[in-house]
Each structure stands twice: as C-alpha cells, then as structure tokens.
Amino acid sequence: MRRPALAASRSAAAALLSVLLSAGLATYARPAEGQRVDLVNRTSLRVCADPANMPFSNDKGEGFENKIAEIVAAELKVPVEYTWFPQATGFIRQTLAAKRCDVVMGYAQGDELVLNTNPYYRSTYALVYRPGAGLDGVDHLADARLSGKRIGVVAGTPPATVMAGLGLIQQAKPYPLLVDRRYDSPGERMIGDIRSGDIDAGVLWGPMAGYFAASGGDKLKVVPLTKEAAGARLAYRITFGVRHLEDDWKRQLNALIARRQGDIDAVLLAFGVPLLDEQSNLITQPRR
C-alpha cells in the first residue's frame, strides 16, 4: 500500500513520501486526453504489490490487501496474478504504468499518479503506548503529558509535522520512511522499542499500528488520532489505484466495492485496522 504521507507532504512543500513510494514516481506521465485505450486483462486480476510489506501484502498472500484482492477476484470470477515489486522509488512507473498489472490495492485518495476508485476504507495515524506507563487516557498529541516524552515517528510523515508544531520533535526518535521491507521494518522496530521502553510512545499509520501492536509481546494501547485541532491532516481515504483514463475499469471496481464493503470491512477489522467513518467515528462492525 502507498501510505498517505506523500499526498499530504507534496501539497506542503517538498514531496515527502507516503508510506511507500517516492520521487521516482514523478516520472510517470499520464496518457494524452483522447488516448483512451483499455489495457485491463479480463482473464485474471493482475495486482501490483510489495512482496514483503505486512500487514498490507506479502508473496505468501498473508496481508489484508492480499485478502481483499481475493474478494475482488472472486467477484470477477478470475484468478489473482501478482507482479511483485518493492514499494519504493519507481513503484508505479515499473508496474502499473508499465502495464505489468491493472490495479494497486491500496492508494491514498487524491494522488495524481493513479486514477483512484471510490475509497474502501478511511483510517488515521495512531498513538501507541504501554498501559500503566503514565500515558493512560492520552488521545491527542497536544496532551501536556506527552511533553518531554521520547516519541517514535516516521520521518517525513504528517504526524512529524504536527509534533514539530507542538514542540515534540526535539526528543523524538525518527524512523526511516523509505526502506526495502524485505530487509527492514521501521514500524515493527518502533513497536519493539515501545515494548522495551526505549521510547515512551510512537505514532504510526493506523493499519500498521494496529497490526504490529497485536503481534506478540505485552498488550499495547493503540489510540487513533482523531482529535488533533491543528497541523497536518492525519486521516486518509484509501482506494484502489488504476491507470488514468481506464474509467470503465474504475466504475467496475466502484460497483464491486459497494457490493462487498461488508466483506472488505471484516478483513480490515480482523487485521486491527482502525476504521473511521466520514465523521471520524470508529467503525467496529462490518458495514452492510
């Protein structure tokens, strides 16, 4: 999945990357208007995905985007076929734009590198901390109890901007944004550092926070950040990404999302993804 930091930071100033993709993507050019050639394969669901990017995807089919791809393929009555490529610089250029696949299963709404479908979920960054360590009840970054605390944050993401505005960056521990997840997992390391006490808390994209906080070790508190009064936006709508001008394919996927929203929600909730409605209320049961 392409995390939402890129779309947010790009409008800010210097094209800071979302969870996964980066500057090399800017080389992808849209087809000229009128060049409406539908290149979608109708005999399989061709998906572009990262082979080592849990909880989103891996080459064993264990991620929630893998599971959602299976729902889509079942609805279309075709098998899933993957093109594997690390979600870093050049991902879209090397996969979707190169016509090696027809859909990216997780893409922040509003990014111009793809044509977005309707969103199939909305989530937010989350604060993670150990219960009983002095932060119980903290539910926003402006809480005075976070002052002076060592907080982990992925560099270049929207919460880093919010933390800077609140004076929380000087003591923060940064984690890298662009990595090859086959060899490094900053989100997983952040959660491990919270458990060990190396940091007091961490701020991480909600789907990663929910998954890694539940993956072994002591129970951690995961608080979706929905109450920030100022600073960068922390909640994002996530869509499927398809090639520009493939409007029929987009409409087909939109209809499929509407039909199978409850099944998609069930997958996301099982992975601990904090789901938000448009009023930023938590969704705790699949929508039907």
Model region roles, listed by residue range:
Residues 12-24:
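Bacterial N-terminal signal peptides
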Residues 33-112, 181-184, 270-274:
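Extracytoplasmic small-molecule ligand-binding "clamshell" domains
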Residues 37, 79, 158-179, 254-288:
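Ligand-binding clefts/hinges and TM-proximal coupling segments of bilobed small-molecule sensing domains
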Residues 46, 51-55, 59-74, 127-186, ...:
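Bilobed "Venus flytrap"/periplasmic-binding protein-like clamshell domains
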Residues 50-51, 122-134, 214-257, 274-288:
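Periplasmic-binding protein-like
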Residues 63-75, 132-135, 139-158, 231-275:
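Extended ligand-binding regions for polar small-molecule ligands
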Residues 70, 74, 79-145, 156, ...:
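Acidic, polar ligand-binding/catalytic clefts
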Residues 78-79, 97-106, 149-150, 189-190, ...:
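Alpha-to-beta junction loops
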